[in-house]
């Protein structure tokens, strides 16, 4: 198969033989990933696979295998539309398409094309099955959207997109096509140029504009991954939004848009994006290993309310760190298989009782237990739904696009998976920070961890499928990107936040129209309502001044004059400087300034948010200082 033919090597894992067979390099058609790795650097990968094979032979119990359902015709697209929040366009739940018009009207042309493509497939499938469901033609809905855009002032959408993108173009491509040297060189010895990542324009639109403006085929990224471009986020005056900063109702909209955007990006670049679905199976609902993350967290939260990362996972990491991260071969050298099996059984029996003797756990054993925990999750840490999409990242032409896809995939992960992945990546970075002593470079760590993340024990794949599933160098490179760019991956792109703001504004208008109709029916004084509505926001605050509420601080409210340079950190500093008594112990980082209401549900502001710029973007917001919810 195509993927197999482009690999440096493959391994077999038959019952008869446990030897790893590394095939010769194919002379042609090497993928991006293979160009960036030499054969020596693959050794850690194959050794790790052999260690996994041995440890699975000593596994303490047979785990029930997750069945990954092969979807019927049209079923994949139907599921996709549900995940994208558009299930009311078809089927038994089909209702007034007006409900989706607000959502669809905020989409870019590439996002709209992705939705249209899936609706047409579902529509054809349902017609074949002779189902009498009313399926609105999405082209009609988008026609309304186009009409409203044509009448809007300020030029067309694609014009503004291109204008906005021009300032970033060239720099991205230059950095994406860096050619590295033969051997692995630590990044700090070869400083790669810093390149701004454009978060203001849809990623799929950027890819399409690049395709349209370039007559030649986009050159694929090459180069040793040690010289990956150093991408950075340009400062956004309205503040950078990170995962965890938004209220749940807005985060739900972000996830819908992230799925549509990811699909649009893969469509534009001609990469197949297949979501998978796990059939529900009976899993353990207590214990430590082979337990779903959500079940683990439920039992942990009974002990420690608000816990977001499994206690056993945290304890294994802290045990490794207690012995110092300078140990040579950390993560690479396995613990003895029999000892690991015994430790697993002992942990299951004693961990929650608090009687387990952690002093008896050697550092390499703790590292092996950590990797075992990840592998034995009933569903992969990267989720059944998106595991293949994470793998397909290696097929995107440029490093910039690979980073953009990973950003959207991280947003799409369930909360428990995303939080645990973040804790893992932060730990791996700390290991790499000690590479001079432990001899574990970012590439070594990526090689060792890739099979543990991408080869989920519970998926129970046959050896032939498994060879295709693991895709050696490709998954190692995806792992490397996750580690290197982790600080960027937990950012919500500005264009998506702006789409959420637009949706909220349109929904408010719709609600207001409904309210006016209702008031008219009730023979209410409509004028009085409109007058009230108009004056609520300018109540007692003069122009150019915001009123900041701080219900839990001694100074509960303050009017603050907006200036060009006023930042969120300045507002916080003014409040905290006036604290006395108990509240004086409040430190920076314990309370945050929030933007609440207007065109957003709730958003925690980063310190560098320029308040005047944000006020202009959301003049109807309230400004509140409070701590982050657990």
Please describe what each predicted stretch is.
Residues 386-387, 399-475:
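Alpha-helical bundle/repeat cores within regulatory domains of eukaryotic proteins
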Residues 1-358, 447, 451-535, 541, ...:
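Intrinsically disordered regulatory linkers and targeting segments
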Residues 270-287, 513-630:
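Intrinsically disordered, Pro/Ser/Thr-rich cytosolic linker and juxtamembrane tail regions that serve as
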Residues 299-303, 307, 381, 404-410, ...:
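An all-alpha helical bundle fold corresponding to the catalytic cores
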Residues 258, 292, 312, 332, ...:
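Beta-strand cores of modular interaction/reader domains in eukaryotic scaffold and signaling proteins
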Residues 319-367, 372-413, 457:
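Alpha-helical cores of eukaryotic small-GTPase signaling modules
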Residues 310-312, 364-372, 480-481, 558-560:
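Conserved, well-structured core segments
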């Amino acid at each position: 198969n195509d993927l197999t033919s482009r690999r440096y090597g493959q391994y077999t894992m038959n019952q008869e033989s446990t030897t790893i067979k590394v095939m010769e390099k194919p002379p042609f058609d090497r993928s991006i990933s293979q160009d960036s790795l030499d054969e020596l650097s693959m050794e850690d990968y194959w050794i790790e696979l052999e260690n996994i094979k041995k440890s699975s032979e000593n596994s303490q119990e047979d785990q029930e295998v997750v069945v990954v359902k092969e979807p019927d015709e049209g079923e994949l697209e139907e599921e996709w539309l549900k995940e994208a929040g558009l299930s009311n366009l078809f089927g038994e739940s089909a209702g007034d398409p007006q409900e989706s018009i607000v959502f669809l009207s905020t989409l870019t042309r590439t996002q709209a094309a992705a939705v249209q493509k899936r609706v047409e497939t579902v529509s054809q499938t349902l017609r074949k099955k002779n189902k009498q469901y009313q399926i609105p033609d999405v082209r009609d809905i988008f026609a309304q959207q186009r009409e409203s855009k044509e009448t809007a002032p300020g030029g067309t959408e694609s014009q503004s997109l291109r204008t906005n993108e021009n300032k970033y173009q060239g720099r991205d491509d230059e950095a994406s096509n860096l050619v590295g040297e033969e051997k692995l060189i630590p990044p700090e010895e070869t400083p790669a140029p810093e390149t701004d990542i454009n978060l203001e324009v849809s990623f799929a639109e950027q890819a399409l504009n690049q395709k349209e403006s370039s007559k030649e085929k986009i050159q694929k990224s090459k180069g040793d991954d040690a010289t990956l471009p150093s991408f950075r986020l340009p400062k956004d005056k309205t503040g950078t939004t990170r995962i965890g900063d938004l209220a749940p109702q807005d985060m739900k909209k972000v996830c819908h848009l992230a799925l549509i955007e990811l699909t649009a990006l893969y469509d534009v670049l001609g990469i197949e994006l297949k979501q998978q679905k796990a059939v529900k199976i009976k899993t353990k609902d207590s214990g430590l290993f082979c337990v779903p993350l959500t079940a683990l967290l439920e039992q942990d939260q009974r002990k420690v309310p608000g816990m977001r990362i499994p206690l056993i996972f945290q304890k294994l990491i802290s045990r490794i760190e207690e012995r110092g991260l300078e140990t040579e071969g950390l993560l690479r050298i396995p613990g003895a298989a029999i000892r690991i099996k015994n430790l697993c059984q002992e942990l299951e029996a004693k961990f929650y009782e608090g009687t387990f003797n952690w002093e008896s756990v050697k550092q390499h054993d703790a590292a092996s237990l950590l990797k075992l925990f990840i592998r034995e999750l009933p569903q992969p840490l990267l989720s059944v739904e998106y595991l293949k999409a994470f793998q397909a990242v290696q097929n995107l032409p440029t490093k910039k696009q690979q980073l953009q896809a990973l950003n959207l995939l991280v947003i799409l992960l369930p909360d428990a998976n995303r939080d645990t992945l973040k804790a893992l990546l932060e730990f791996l970075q700390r290991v790499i920070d000690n590479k001079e002593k432990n001899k574990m470079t970012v590439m070594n760590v990526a090689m060792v961890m890739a099979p543990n993340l991408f080869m989920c024990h519970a998926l129970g794949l046959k050896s032939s499928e498994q060879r295709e599933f693991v895709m050696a160098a490709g998954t190692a490179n995806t792992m490397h990107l996750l580690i290197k760019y982790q600080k960027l991956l937990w950012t919500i792109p500005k264009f998506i936040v702006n789409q959420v703001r637009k949706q909220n504004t349109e929904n408010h208008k719709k609600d207001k129209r409904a309210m006016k109709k209702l008031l008219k029916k009730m023979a209410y004084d409509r004028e009085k309502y409109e007058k009230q509505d108009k004056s609520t926001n300018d109540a007692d605050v003069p122009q150019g001044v915001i009123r900041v509420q701080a219900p839990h601080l001694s100074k509960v409210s303050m009017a603050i004059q907006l200036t060009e340079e006023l930042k969120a950190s300045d507002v916080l500093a003014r409040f905290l400087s006036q604290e006395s008594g108990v509240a004086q112990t409040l430190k920076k980082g314990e309370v945050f300034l929030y933007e609440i209401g207007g065109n957003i549900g709730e958003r925690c502001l980063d310190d560098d948010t320029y308040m005047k710029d944000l006020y202009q973007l959301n003049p109807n917001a309230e400004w509140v200082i409070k701590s982050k919810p657990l």
